[in-house]
């Protein structure tokens, strides 16, 4: 099914009223709704417009327990860079099921150049009502190519946000593209990331970092050598399908499902893969390729959604290369 005829980096959730809601970047941030579990979709509505030579990119969305919908996104200024336009994280809120949206809300700014920017926000609500946004952050590393995963907290449903703290960093490398979940045990936060620091891989590999809900990242960050940093795939059942852009979700019965992009068995182009993990988000296996494409076609910046009674929806940005 086509959700957006143009754009990329799409994510889907199921709302409390049963509808599906999708978001993507396409000359700003667009949303669409489906009332029939994805068979048909409403015409896209643009809720964030690009201004001041600053594209808004890579959105994520969440519905809070109180019904508020939040879309987070990433302003990425275009060249020529100016110090007044920084790479940042922003969000908008809707309290009427997506009909109207708040003004833009500031979360974080990195630096004003591409090499020291921030990227790819993704949100998680905790049982306490605390809302977290995780993102890839080069802002602290102005003298190197390193990158960490940072996280900001909101205690008022996304209206205001605290300062960032690092939750994972492998010295000399680039932890990126976080996708957080709370496991079914309601005791463990797991964040899927891309990690290009595994010895011998010379590429990104889908990885998890984790923390107890009790600790909740307070004065705690996962280092490159930490026992709380794990490769995702079980190589007894899966090939070494290196790649990045992971996305992680929890199934109703506790198992976990991961997507990522890889050139494995796909020539020089990238496609989408998924695998199923256990209730601890470990030992991912049953690897599959949701979109069967020619090796000349790309499926990138993908995600998975879990809807209805546990249906897994693969969401891919397809590009036919001419």
Predicted segments with their positions:
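Asp-box/BNR beta-propeller blade signature and adjacent active/binding-site loops
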Residues: 1-322
């Amino acid at each position: 099914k086509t959700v957006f005829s143009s754009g990329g980096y799409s994510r889907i959730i199921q709302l409390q009223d049963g509808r599906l809601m999708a978001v993507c970047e396409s000359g700003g941030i667009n949303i669409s709704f489906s009332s029939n579990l994805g068979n048909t979709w409403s015409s896209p509505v643009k809720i964030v417009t690009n201004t001041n030579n600053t594209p808004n990119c890579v959105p994520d969305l969440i519905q809070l327990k109180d019904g508020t919908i939040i879309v987070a996104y990433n302003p990425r200024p275009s060249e020529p860079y100016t110090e007044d336009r920084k790479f940042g994280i922003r969000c908008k809120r809707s309290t009427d099921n997506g009909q109207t949206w708040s003004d833009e809300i500031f979360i974080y700014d990195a630096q004003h150049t591409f090499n020291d920017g921030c990227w790819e926000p993704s949100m998680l609500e905790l049982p306490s009502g605390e809302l977290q946004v995780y993102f890839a952050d080069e802002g602290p590393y102005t003298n190197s190519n390193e990158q960490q995963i940072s996280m900001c907290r909101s205690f008022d449903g996304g209206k205001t946000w605290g300062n960032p703290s690092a939750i994972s960093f492998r010295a000399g490398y680039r932890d990126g593209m976080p996708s957080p979940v709370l496991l079914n045990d309601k005791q463990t936060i797991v964040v899927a990331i891309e990690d290009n620091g595994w010895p011998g891989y010379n590429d990104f590999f889908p990885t998890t970092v984790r923390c107890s809900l009790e600790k909740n990242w307070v004065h705690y960050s996962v280092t490159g050598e930490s026992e709380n940093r794990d490769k995702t795939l079980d190589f007894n059942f899966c090939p070494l399908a290196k790649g990045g852009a992971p996305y992680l979700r929890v199934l109703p019965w506790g198992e976990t499902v991961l997507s990522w992009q890889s050139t494995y068995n796909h020539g020089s182009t990238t496609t989408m893969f998924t695998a199923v993990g256990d209730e601890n988000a470990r030992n991912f296996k049953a690897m599959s390729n949701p979109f069967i494409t020619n090796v000349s076609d790309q499926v990138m910046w993908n995600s998975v959604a879990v809807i209805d009674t546990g249906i897994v929806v693969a969401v891919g940005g397809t590009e036919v290369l001419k």
